[in-house]
């Protein structure tokens, strides 16, 4: 499904059921904008991630695309359940969504892969540009010039993406 705000609870329940029956991952855009998170908290009393957790959608086969506006509780839940995050730095900058807390996610043990989101919100589907931006954004947001080294960015764009897709160690 595109995002939690586009799918009601009964449909989410069916998605979870089919994903479990067929051993398929669930991927969705999650906490991409502040407005999305605020709207979800008003509607359900929970963050978008916690709503999906209550519906049984989260776990090792869950892939959260963006995760820009996740809080500490969300990060802890993502890590505890073995969920994956796909960081889309170019898209998040182009759409002024914000900057994902990648270093906090990594420090918590969340598998973070890199993505482009798509041509409409990116203009270029260039994995090297995504690696560069992920590294630079991490440095500027943490104040640590060593944050997300080139080798880490390369791993996020390759092996960590494969891991998120359930391909294991390739």
List PLM regions with ranges.
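Glycine-rich, flexible loop/turn motifs
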Residues: 36, 48, 89-91, 127, ...
